[in-house]
Amino acid sequence: MPKRDDIEKVLVIGSGPITIGQAAEFDYSGAQAIKALKSLGYRVVVINSNSATIMTDPEFSDAVYIEPLTIDFLEAVIEKERPDALLPTLGGQTALNLAVELFKKGVLCKYDVELIGVKPDTIEKAEDREQFKTAMKNCGLEVLESRLVSSVTEAMDVVREFGYPVVIRPSFTLGGSGGGIAYNLQELKAIVENGLIESPAHTVLIEKSVIGWKEYELEVMKDHEDNFIVVCSIENFDPMGIHTGDSVTVAPAQTLTDVEYQCMRNAARKALSAIGFDAGGCNIQFAVDTYTGKLVIIEMNPRVSRSSALASKATGYPIAKISALLAVGLRLDEIPNSITEQTTAAFEPSIDYVVVKMPRFQMEKFPGAEQKLGTQMKSVGEVMSIGRTFKEALGKAVRSLELDIAPKLDLRNMREHLANPTSERMSYIFAAFRNSLSVDEVHELTFINKWFLTEIEEIMNFEKVLRKKKPKDFGSLKKAKEFGFSDRELAEIYKVQEEEIRKIRHKLGVTPVYKMVDTCSAEFEAKTPYFYSTYNGMENETIPSKRRKIMVLGSGPNRIGQGIEFDYANVHAVWAFQEEGYEVIMVNSNPETVSTDYDISDKLYFEPLTTEDILEIAKIENPDGIVVSFGGQTPLRIARALEKEGLKILAANYELIDLTESRDRFAKFLKQSGLSVPPFSVARSIKEALRAAELIGFPVLIRPSYVLGGRAMAIVDHKKDLLSYISNASLISPDHPLIIDKFLENAVELDVDVISDGENVWIAGLMEQIEKAGIHSGDSACVLPPVSLSDDLIEKIEHLIYRLIKSLKIIGPANIQLAVKDDKVYVIELNLRASRTIPFVSKAIGIPVAKIAAKTIIGKKLSQLLLRYWPYSTKERLVKYEPARSGVLPTPWPEYYSVKEAIIPFNKFSGVDILLGPEMRSTGEVMGIGDDFAEAFAKAQLSADGISTKSLLVTVNDRDKREIVPLVSYLYDLGFEVFATAGTGKILRSMGIAVKNVFKVGEGKPDVVDLIRQGKIGFIVITQSPNRKTSAEINREAENSFADDERTAGYKIRTAAIQCKVPCITTIEAFRAEVSAIRRLKKSTLSVRSLQDIFYAQQNTLLKK
């Protein structure tokens, strides 16, 4: 069946910001699908609110709209673009929910838009828990006993029948949001209440518990002709009860018999038919009773999912690409397999290796959060590893996580930790076998399949054997590497340096070989160079070429501070080097990303980003240089070791990296260079820290070196706060000094992305943070161009940056953070790499910043590179292109405004206080573009938490009370209902605002929390008292969140707001911006414009000059 010719234009909905449960895998899927549709000649329109994505690059599609993912904005885009079809299966749960809403509201019918890939009734049947259960029963498949409820009372009735524990699953949600396992009435009430809020349908399924059963997933494909294949079987290492996103998973399934697998395969096919699935990829989850073999179907996702990305990378079968082609009418047997070039997509992949996916957690970023894992996902990222055996793949996965510090385990309560899994689950399992627990004992506590536990026991037993051997024992060393032990682990066992192990290995000839991922277990010759290492093989399948080569190091697992933005930069760097004729080798361990798509680079090595693994690849490939500038902190950390081993690091040598990453050295360098820095001191002990803080004067900012995302940074106001921080952080030592800076209160922070070619300097993006100093730039909203800087100040900033870049002799990208106070510019820090704001800046100015930065690294000159994009808008609206006298090339200054807003997953971590500080906690971002700041900010907020236009609650500290009066007064005049606590209400009332007083918690009923839960509050303005809390205090408050003392009153309001999805503003600056957005919304309807239209209009205006 040929492609459909009645369709010309297809609208693709993205998944929005990166958050827990919906991450970079949807950019990978979207980018693949867009490329596939374009290859068939279709026009493609994309709408997404997330600028940090390859799929929103204007070169990729015919029209890209970075707009809020709401029905109103989608309808506006549809009205303007008039697409023939809408493809909703590539944007996660967000896109599916929007597609259903567009259908129900008649928008698709009104504009004659066809839903392709999946039909509305199919989505309803798959996503509505009750409909799904009925459909499965009707086709003879067993499901878990369950009831759909819409109130706590109904849930209590169901539990009387089922008994505890029960699993609560909200409808139409992702990542298990709002769900959980209830073991008693108190937990039931709390989870059901939260689940009803999280569910768009306001229903939850109460399910009879099968905690401890084995969990499996099948990734399947189906076309219009009912051809069906299984792409990959995936087995969860952890049993039912832990969200699959938080579980270690293994592909292919290891403990299924062939009979069980065929039974599961047939069930999957029946399930697709039962819900009327049209064409594309689908993920189906099963549970199997370990003792009886009973099989039940848990749920299905009628779309490309997180597991689809994993299955694609695990097998080499591009699920998203083929899903898009099936959606427009092709059959599986009409789509060629691009890896073999001999088979078609109708051939089921066959793999002769084992893949392990391991989640990456960052619980330390959310003090006070529930640590126990359950049905609500908590991991922020993941890694994938490939080995010839489970043991080897497991070892590679563990080192891919890049965990710098071994967790402190509570071995005295080890059994309790095994029975109640946390993010440290795997460490406790290793510890259990080190402490001689048997497989049966660990199985009884964890319900993990004995096959997996036996494999781990064998690894731990062999570790004991190694401790009795010498490192030069060939047999032991060879077996250790086959079992997945890293050189670093062996060095710790033998009490020698890692370099010593490497030398012994090479001398004894114990080195890895590289095998190809080919979809067919070598049955056909593969054309695509996609490799993994193994010590369980003889033949090397990678053949190095004689071309000029560059090796690009990826960013590893997504984590807070190092997310999709760095993969975006890496992909652009790869394309830039390829354009200049280089063969590009990509090394990365993250299955969610575009960079690990096999057709992005010339060669892909799916390997851990460690010194050991990079050196082994370099030994074979012999690259001309290694690029560490685009992968965040991960590549920078190993640059020294790579350089020491003779590899050439392009653009940044270790000495320069160490100077900029070492807080004390860099601060001293700035001072010696005559550049302004806040007063500071270096402390190597608690005594020195206390003395330094007293000399500088409180408040002070405390910063360790070599951290990303503000890890372990804090602002402290008093001596007791400082002592609390140091004892809690355990970071200070002679080898790990802390920098104590004077905290610049009320300073304006600037984020600057800059590129240098060694001669000229180009400020690509000058961004102003909306919140004042003290909040990490990754968590603060920012605007480009700045809105409050004078011309003189801008000139001063440009001159300062030029001096700094030239004095450090930087070539390539850098990110500089500045603070402006009383018209004085202070340098806060410099990062010798591309920053997380690169994608945002690229979309804001219409120039691919990462590409330009990459080309300067290989000797290209900025003046020539930027000429291609001239004229671009500058502050002076220049018509002639030439460097300024200072050597600073014209800084882009768009005629429109762009705002970046952070997305923080507080809803996933109940009990966490939402107050922001110098340690980053956001996982993603959204972007708003408008003619003025107010419009851009309004769009950014609509993309994030939304904007309320009905009522607000105000409770602020004494210092902020006068500042809020005109802001609240304006909203009151617009018709907002204003609630306030006593002190704030008194000030507002004295200024003529009719305020409704509310009780604080513990002062009377109904109190402020009651009003929030009753839905009477649209948004909240609550500012922190001048006495800031340290992370230790926030942690203690969270653990004691039911106390009624005054200290926890604000905490209770903020946590209630998160639970009830009420936007909560915690700074005056953000409130001021929110009011400007509300004013703009009241004034007129917000427009929608594609990036192509924006850039074309701006360039046209300039050319007319």
Swiss-Prot record:
Record text on cofactor binding: Binds 4 Mg(2+) or Mn(2+) ions per subunit.
Binding site for Mg(2+) 1: Q285, E299
Binding sites annotated in the UniProt record for ATP 1: R129, R169, G175, G176, K208, V210, E215, G241, I242, H243, Q285, E299
Record's keyword annotation contains Protease: no
Chain sites annotated for binding Mg(2+) 4: E829, N831
The ATP-grasp domain, residue ranges: 133-328, 667-858
A GO cellular-component term linked to this record: cytoplasm
Region (Allosteric domain): 946-1105
Protein keywords: Amino-acid biosynthesis, Arginine biosynthesis, ATP-binding, Ligase, Magnesium, Manganese, Metal-binding, Nucleotide-binding, Pyrimidine biosynthesis, Repeat
Binding positions for Mg(2+) 3 per the UniProt entry: Q817, E829
Necessary cofactors: Mg(2+); Mn(2+)
Residues that bind Mg(2+) 2: E299, N301
Amino acids binding ATP 2: R703, K742, L744, E749, G774, I775, H776, S777, Q817, E829
Residue span of region Carboxyphosphate synthetic domain: 1-402
Domain MGS-like: 940-1101
Single biological process term from Gene Ontology: L-arginine biosynthetic process
Catalytic activity: hydrogencarbonate + L-glutamine + 2 ATP + H2O = carbamoyl phosphate + L-glutamate + 2 ADP + phosphate + 2 H(+)
Leader peptide range in chain numbering: none
Protein purpose: Large subunit of the glutamine-dependent carbamoyl phosphate synthetase (CPSase). CPSase catalyzes the formation of carbamoyl phosphate from the ammonia moiety of glutamine, carbonate, and phosphate donated by ATP, constituting the first step of 2 biosynthetic pathways, one leading to arginine and/or urea and the other to pyrimidine nucleotides.
Subunit structure comment from the entry: Composed of two chains; the small (or glutamine) chain promotes the hydrolysis of glutamine to ammonia, which is used by the large (or ammonia) chain to synthesize carbamoyl phosphate. Tetramer of heterodimers (alpha,beta)4.
Protein name: Carbamoyl phosphate synthase large chain
Organism of this sequence: Pseudothermotoga lettingae (strain ATCC BAA-301 / DSM 14385 / NBRC 107922 / TMO) (Thermotoga lettingae)
